[in-house]
């Protein structure tokens, strides 16, 4: 047994000299490629990310609200109050939106008319009686023309009532019915005054509405 161990010890140094440990040597090209594939350091990545986020903040991107603001809901009373305020009409400030009118424009002047149209329709209704009244009232669209036709027709009615009452060509036409004569006479007089008075009021409208907001006027004949 001792001889076997001595022989093994003598053989082992001789075998060890035949082997050499190879070092891990790499070629220069592979070493450069490995250095190029290495990831960048963490500090450079953090600096680039901070610069990117600073750029986004400077460009005007909206920041999200905080958690408290995003999760805070209004109470029931506040919600009802906001709803009630939204439904209230802004009536007190409405008059400030209107602009006063310096004068009537051409369209308003055509609706009112002038004295010439009033006199023309007045004489048409007075001379041609009901035919002149219908023609002048239907062919004119201005207030002066229609009020002139009404006034002229009223005076024409008075004229014919007086002719029939005191003429010898119509004897006994109103015998026993004098109340009917008074009814037509008063009716003609009221129509005559109505046309003149209403036209006088219409003529003053440009002065009345010159300092008021734009108003739509409805004429009732």
From Swiss-Prot:
The keyword Ubl conjugation applies. A motif (PPxY motif 1) lies at residues 39-42. It is a multi-pass membrane protein. Pfam families: NEDD4_Bsd2. GO terms for molecular function: WW domain binding. Residues 138-143, 194-221 are extracellular. The modification N-acetylalanine is found at residue 2. The PPxY motifs are required for E3 ubiquitin-protein ligase binding and activation and for ubiquitination. Activates HECT domain-containing E3 ubiquitin-protein ligases, including NEDD4 and ITCH, and consequently modulates the stability of their targets. As a result, controls many cellular processes. Prevents chronic T-helper cell-mediated inflammation by activating ITCH and thus controlling JUNB degradation. Promotes pancreatic beta cell death through degradation of JUNB and inhibition of the unfolded protein response, leading to reduction of insulin secretion. This is NEDD4 family-interacting protein 1. It comes from Rattus norvegicus. The gene is Ndfip1.
């Amino acid at each position: 047994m001792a001889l076997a161990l001595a022989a093994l010890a003598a053989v082992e140094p001789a075998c060890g000299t035949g082997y050499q440990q190879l070092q891990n040597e790499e070629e220069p090209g592979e070493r450069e490629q490995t250095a190029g594939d290495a990831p960048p350091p963490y500090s450079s990545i953090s600096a680039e990310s901070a610069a990117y986020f600073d750029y986004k903040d400077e460009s005007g991107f909206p920041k999200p609200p905080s958690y408290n603001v995003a999760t805070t809901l209004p109470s029931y009373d506040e919600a009802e109050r906001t709803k009630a305020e939204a439904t209230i009409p802004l009536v007190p400030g409405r008059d400030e939106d209107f602009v006063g009118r310096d004068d009537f424009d051409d369209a308003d002047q055509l609706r009112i008319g002038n004295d010439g149209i009033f006199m023309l329709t007045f004489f048409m209704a007075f001379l041609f009686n009901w035919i002149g009244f219908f023609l002048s009232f239907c062919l004119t669209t201005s207030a002066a023309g229609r009020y002139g036709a009404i006034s002229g027709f009223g005076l024409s009615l008075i004229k014919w009532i007086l002719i029939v009452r005191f003429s010898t060509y119509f004897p006994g036409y109103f015998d026993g019915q004098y109340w009917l004569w008074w009814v037509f006479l008063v009716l003609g007089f009221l129509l005559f005054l109505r046309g003149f008075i209403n036209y006088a009021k219409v003529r003053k409208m440009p002065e009345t509405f010159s300092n008021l907001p734009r108003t739509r006027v409805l004429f009732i004949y």
